[in-house]
């Protein structure tokens, strides 16, 4: 069974921005939430562009250091990078690996600390 369509659907339905990058720091995928979040920076038009062009030199240095750390061990897969108090959100970088455990890319993971405001089982 090809699970790719299922995995893509998980990403497409996520309300948090998901931006996937390859090891050359090229943005290879943005989910709809990411396209909306980064709309003022060209949104979906960022696909194919370098993530490093979206950050300052200090941030780029940190990104490079994290990717290097991911490459040192198959066990190095997630690192906490910041807390965004404005959005009450933790930010992580997460390694992407192939079936053999080889590093193939990375993404930034957002986890919001806010309590859910949606009503339970609200079948509108």
Task: Label every model-predicted segment.
Residues 1-35:
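Sensory modules in modular signal-transduction proteins
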């Amino acid at each position: 069974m090809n699970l790719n369509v299922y995995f893509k659907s998980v990403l497409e339905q996520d309300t948090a921005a998901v931006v996937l990058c390859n090891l050359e720091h090229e943005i290879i995928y943005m989910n709809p939430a990411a396209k909306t979040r980064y709309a003022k920076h060209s949104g979906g038009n960022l696909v194919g562009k370098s993530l490093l062009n979206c950050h300052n030199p200090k941030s780029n240095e940190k990104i490079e250091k994290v990717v290097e750390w991911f490459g040192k061990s198959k066990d190095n897969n997630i690192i906490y990078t910041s807390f965004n108090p404005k959005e009450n959100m933790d930010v992580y970088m997460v390694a992407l690996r192939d079936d053999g455990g080889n590093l193939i890319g990375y993404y930034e993971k957002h986890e919001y600390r806010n309590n859910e405001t949606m009503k339970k089982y609200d079948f509108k």
